[in-house]
Amino acid sequence: MSTEANKALIRRHFAEIWNEYQLHVADELVSPSYHSHFPLPGQPPGIAGFKFAVQALRTSFPDLSITVHDLIAEDDKVAARLTARGTHQGSFRGIAPTGRGVEWSGIRIFHIADGKIVEHWANWDDLGLLQQLSAR
């Protein structure tokens, strides 16, 4: 695939799977052998693990929205600079729902092969997110 096609795949990944919560689209865009280098506790391997992560975050933040600010592609990799926003309405990392609106930023790098996401790396501002969720 071209770098533009790879970027389009990642745009669709965020728009349809994460923002519109159309989890079935993962079957089209994510490889069965998908590997996360940033797994959640208890996340299984493969596409089941990808779906697990989406469901877990959407349970904690049902109105989750991810804004893609930049996509940079080279060969079979796409890097994305992102901002996530949501309302904490379900338990997250042992923190009971607070009802607070939160926002955190991150960078993700995707490896694409045969038109599907096969692995990804992530770096999110977890400290900033946890500070927003904790009592002040």
What is each model feature region?
Residues M1-R136:
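C-terminal and inter-domain tail/linker signature
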